[in-house]
Amino acid sequence: MVKNADTNNESNFWSLKYRPDSLDDMIGRETFKEGTKGFLNGGNLPHMIFSGPKGYGKTTAALLLSEEILGDSFQANCKIVYASDPITSEERAEIRRQSYVSTSKVGSMAGKQFSWPAFLFSRVKPFVEVRPIGVNKVKILIIRDFHKLKAEQQGFRRLMEKYSRSCRMILITDEISSVIDPILSRCRLFFFHKVNKKSFCSLIEEICEKEDVKIKSTIPEMIYEAVNGRIGDGINLLQKAAANSNNKIGPNSLYRVNNDSISLSLNVLIRSVLQSKMDVAIDKAEALLDAGYSFSEILRGLCQEVYHLPLHNLRK
């Protein structure tokens, strides 16, 4: 259900303007909401893993769930970190500084240098070591792209065990096979798939009504297919199409906008392969995956795009 835009932030981006305020506002996530009822009713809160393709609401669900659990102390007791973000030079300098035990210290460790997993030491440990603020018994740490940790996962498992009384982890990943078994066995697993077509189309129709956008009856379903059920991408596509067609969207105007958004990247990818520029092709493919497109979507797009390229010229 779309929130009343008057009660929202006045963002120019519809995907932010119509972002859900609570779990109840999330469409098409009935299984997830049913599975978390016990936590919200005061039950034992487990560590969790949210798995699924990019763009299906995993991070939004994690933040909304954390906010409902923590209440007024949400800002103080919840933190989100990104495993895909590189460690900064300042963080590395701090790790080096703290990994050395001064010779002025008493004991066998004096003068020794330790090696710490950079991500865990700089972004996880400082948060989990501090006790919850206020009346809450636990804090919540959300880690996006958890599969990127790779070798640091064993160290993370030990932190999970050590601070399990005061901190819960929500791990977000689109590569569940890259998460080690000891962590999987300690977490409640939730899978996020694309929302059903009926719920998606109803949302698009409600937004169009609130934004005074005129659409053909087939447009919501066309948007659903174009973005493979990703709500945020669907709302962005709707806004872009509305801006380019004076708020009157038909199949042709929608096709032009959607085709432009991915067609250029696919075009460059194919041309790079044919010209043996594999580094450029790999970068484009990774950028499309990072943008949330699945392998099957990219392959379908490549099959369509290849027919429009002057291959006889490119092969010369």
PLM region descriptions:
Residues 238, 242-267, 299-300, 315-316:
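Conserved C-terminal helix/linker of AAA+ ATPases
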Residues 1-4, 269-316:
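Helix-rich C-terminal "collar"/helical-bundle subdomain used as an assembly and partner-interaction module
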Residues 121, 197-205, 217-224, 282:
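An amphipathic alpha-helix signature
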Residues 220-226, 232-246, 268-271, 282-287, ...:
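C-terminal helical "lid" of AAA+/P-loop NTPase domains
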Residues 51, 55, 209, 218-232, ...:
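A short helix-loop-helix "switch/interaction" segment in the helical subdomain of ASCE P-loop NTPases
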